[in-house]
Amino acid sequence: MRHNNAGKRLGRTTSHRIAMYRNMVTSFLNHERITTTDAKAKGLRSIAEKMITLGKKGDLNAMRQAASFIRDKKVVTKLFTTIAPRYAERAGGYTRIIKLGIRPGDNAPLSVIELVEETIQAPKAKKKIAAKKPATKVAAKAASATAESAPVATANDAAPAEEAEVQGVKDPAEDCEAKAD
């Protein structure tokens, strides 16, 4: 019976599961973002957040505890010097899981687990207002009549404005070609 044993077993023995999580948390803290299955990402999240909390403590005992779980000394140093200070004012929730879809080979649900960046905010999308189609034929005729009576810009009038815009903007393809030469 598995009473009072929290956590998913993931079809592995205890030693294999612990070794897998040690490898995953080391890789996660090194790269700050990894792709894995949903179940592994959910299990990794709690361990990674505990490691970051240890990093926020910053004392020698916390460093030794983190080093006993994380396999690489450079990653432990990175945790205590760069990652943990980023979240000094945050009380938890250092990671986010983004679902990607399914893996083609075995239909396993994939996710990306990454560290939350406080400074980066998603840009707000501009809403485009589309022209509504006229509901009746009478409205369509009225709309076409107003369009015909409006002054029409000639090609010569629009050309200087387009040239002014093009002169200030660099084509990214030109930069790539220059680098290739």
From Swiss-Prot:
Compositionally biased tracts (Basic and acidic residues): 171-181
Molecular functions per Gene Ontology: structural constituent of ribosome
Assigned keywords, A-Z: Ribonucleoprotein, Ribosomal protein
Biased composition (Low complexity): 141-159
InterPro entries: Ribosomal_bL17, Ribosomal_bL17_CS, Ribosomal_bL17_sf
Location of region: Disordered: 141-181
GO BP annotations listed: translation
Disulfide bonds: none
Top-level lineage group: Bacteria
Pfam families: Ribosomal_L17
Record field: transmembrane: none
GO cellular component: cytosolic large ribosomal subunit
Classification via PANTHER family: LARGE RIBOSOMAL SUBUNIT PROTEIN BL17M, RIBOSOMAL PROTEIN L17
Family classification: Belongs to the bacterial ribosomal protein bL17 family.
Oligomer status and interactors: Part of the 50S ribosomal subunit. Contacts protein L32.
NCBIfam families, sorted: L17
Name of the protein in question: Large ribosomal subunit protein bL17
Lineage start: Bacteria, Pseudomonadati, Thermodesulfobacteriota, Desulfuromonadia, Geobacterales
Gene: rplQ
